[in-house]
């Protein structure tokens, strides 16, 4: 018989703001910033490598923060937290702004070629 799933932590909007703020701050801790930078450099802006190298480091950093709020210390906890944040994004502009900031810490900036740098026409 399968056991009942663990109770998902519930956070109020205010609590979600606090946790999200702590997660963002965790990426600024020198040790974590160095880990992320090393993973990004190893990935060489290749999206496949970003998923293999950067995402696991980012997940670990988030797990270190959110486990104190009842989320499990596995990838599932980060996914549940992300769903909770997504739900509150539409209700709270501060959470929406922090969510954008967190995503910018996780995803590489999209580099687009300069306009006019295509194939020369002659």
Curated annotation (Swiss-Prot):
Q: Which residues form a coiled coil?
A: none
Cell compartments where the protein resides: Cytoplasm
- Enumerate the InterPro entries for this protein: P_C10 (IPR026317)
Under the heading Pfam families, the entry gives: P_C10
GO terms for CC?
cytoplasm
**Family of this protein:** Belongs to the UPF0456 family.
Which protein, by its recorded name, is this?
Protein C10
């Amino acid at each position: 018989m399968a056991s009942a799933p663990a109770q998902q932590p519930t956070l109020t909007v205010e609590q979600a703001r606090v946790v999200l703020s702590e997660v963002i701050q965790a990426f600024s801790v020198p040790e974590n910033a160095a880990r992320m930078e090393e993973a990004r450099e190893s990935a060489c802006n290749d999206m496949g490598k970003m998923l293999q190298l950067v995402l696991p480091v980012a997940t670990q950093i988030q797990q270190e923060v959110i486990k104190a709020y009842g989320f499990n210390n596995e990838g599932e906890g980060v996914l549940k937290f992300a769903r909770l944040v997504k739900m509150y994004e539409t209700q709270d502009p501060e959470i929406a702004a922090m969510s954008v900031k967190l995503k910018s810490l996780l995803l590489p900036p999209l580099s687009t070629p300069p306009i006019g740098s295509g194939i020369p026409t002659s």
